[in-house]
Amino acid sequence: MTLRRDALQTLQLNVGRKCNQACRHCHVDAAPWRTEMMNGATAHRVADWIVEHRPPIVDITGGAPELNEHFRFLVEVGCEAGAHVIDRNNLTVIEEPGLDYLPAYLAEHEVEVIASLPCYSAENVNKQRGNGVFEKSISALRKLNAVGYGTSLPLNLVYNPLGAKLPGPQQELEADYKDVLGREFGIVFNHLYTITNQPIARFAEDLRRQGKWDEYLELLAASFNPETVAGLMCRTTLSVDYEGRLYDCDFNQMLDMRIRNGRDLFLWDVTPDTLTGRAIQTGNHCLACTAGCGSSCTGALRQ
């Protein structure tokens, strides 16, 4: 099956690998000690492209994108260009010294926050993300709620399963999250997005260490759902790394599967129209996006 790109909807900027966490499932291998970050020259070239080509959505991710010194510049350029801007936020970054301005800043610019919270129980979150992460995440969610997120501003949470299994039904999990977070912590949010763990980076290492690599790939293959193909995010998303190179998705970026035309292509080498119809690079990991109800950076593809 050859997948081809449709019209561009989402420009996803991965502005660096640095993060204040080092989660077991992270497909980016992000961590506090990573140094790969988008510099000012690249950020300005990206900004020029956004202004010229006006992508409908600018999705800023990492690592923890807020740790990049050019994060606010890119947010403001995206907003001024009329894009819907998304911040992929790990929540605990809001609790870091010097970053307590984030809730008010994001609210001021009406940025959508997509926040990762792999479970509504402290035990499971701390197991996957480290001790104290759940408590910091709850504190950050309360701060986001206090400035209007979850009511007048979009706050969506992301769920990743613990271990080598597919996510449960998205609507049921969303109802459970809303019940527990609302009842126990007074937290509100808009939607829950379920994302299937990709068999790459740290999660792949875990699978191999546990002897579950083949079993997980067999599960993904056996769960292939052809109805997910039309909505795959790689068809309408362009992934940009911290140096400006292009990929069909953030997962391909982490596997260094670059969009090429005899050489590496950078964002400033292309226009949205020149990308339409190009063949998408695929691998075994792509089965994670087509398994069961499907998976994308905005959750399940089928209900």
Where are these regions (language model features)?
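C-terminal accessory regions of radical SAM enzymes
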Residues: 221-255
